[in-house]
């Protein structure tokens, strides 16, 4: 019953992986139907998507969607391929938000995208990946349109790194948040290691404090991943309990959503 068997015409090979082609309307509907089935059958709190839309580029090889793009153009479509790919993802995100809330309006919908919208945005920020032109994810647009209940940008850099400054990036995402959705940045907790690592426990502590100062109404953050906390790598669990997790956290209320029935 796997999609690579039942829906062979929806799947393409890119590198060593099989991908459902977002340019195929049936592929998008298939994914939405799977999510809708989970929402309807199970008592879930939310639907969370990670940072995979179109795949991360593999060298100079382009994603193999010539057939679906040709069908779009033959049908009268006018968008260039980049804008067409973004429109496919935009439509999926919008449809997902509406579909989930049509069934259970209290279920949260959130996405954790790559933490930098584009290289040079905001000014001075550097990135080896342009998610707008590489993953075809126009994340600021999703925020502006209110197609998310929370956004968890993967801010996996320290506060004092000029090229990818945690605070500068967090401020940027808050500035895009005209609908007042929750902004809960992802922290790179998994990079903490006993005996050293790319991230120190004090850095996480400072980032958590910063997120609380920036948003006193709906503060929050997400750890990637819980493994370091559970293993208390470099005593991070104990330090956070002592310095920033001193009280039980209440589940946030998202005021634009109804209460669970």
Locate the predicted segments by residue.
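Short, solvent-exposed turn/loop segments enriched in Gly/Ser/Thr/Pro and often Arg
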Residues: 50-56, 113-116, 227
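Short beta-strand segments at enzyme active-site cores
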Residues: 46-50, 109-112, 223
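Active-site mouth loops of central-metabolism enzymes
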Residues: 16-30, 122-133, 194-202
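Active-site-proximal loop/short-helix segments
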Residues: 1, 6-9, 41-80
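Secondary-structure boundary elements
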Residues: 36-50, 98-105
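Glycoside hydrolase catalytic-domain groove-lining segments
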Residues: 62-124, 129-195
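Substrate-binding cleft of secreted/luminal carbohydrate-active enzymes
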Residues: 136-162, 174-260
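Active-site-adjacent "subsite" loops/lids of carbohydrate-active enzymes
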Residues: 1-41, 134
């Amino acid at each position: 019953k796997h999609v690579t068997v039942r829906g062979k015409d929806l799947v393409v090979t890119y590198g060593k992986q099989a991908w459902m082609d977002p340019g195929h309307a049936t592929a998008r509907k298939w994914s939405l139907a799977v999510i809708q089935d989970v929402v309807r059958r199970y008592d879930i709190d939310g639907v969370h998507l990670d940072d995979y839309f179109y795949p991360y580029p593999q060298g100079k090889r382009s994603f193999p969607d010539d057939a679906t793009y040709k069908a779009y153009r033959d049908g009268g479509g006018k968008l260039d391929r980049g804008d067409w790919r973004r429109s496919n993802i935009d439509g999926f995100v919008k449809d997902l938000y509406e579909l989930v809330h049509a069934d259970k309006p209290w279920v949260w919908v959130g996405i954790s995208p790559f933490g930098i919208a584009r290289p040079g945005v905001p000014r001075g920020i550097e990135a080896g990946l342009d998610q707008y032109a590489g993953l075809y994810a126009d994340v600021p647009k999703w925020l502006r349109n209110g197609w998310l209940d929370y956004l968890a940008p993967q801010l996996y850099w320290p506060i004092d790194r000029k090229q990818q400054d945690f605070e500068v990036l967090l401020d940027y995402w808050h500035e895009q948040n005209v609908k007042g959705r929750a902004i809960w940045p992802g922290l790179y907790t998994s990079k903490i290691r006993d005996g050293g690592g790319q991230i120190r426990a004090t850095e996480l502590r400072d980032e958590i404090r910063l997120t609380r100062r920036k948003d006193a109404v709906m503060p929050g953050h997400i750890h990637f991943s819980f493994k370091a906390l559970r293993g208390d790598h470099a005593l991070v669990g104990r330090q956070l309990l002592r310095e920033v997790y001193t009280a039980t956290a209440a589940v946030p209320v998202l005021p634009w959503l109804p209460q669970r029935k």
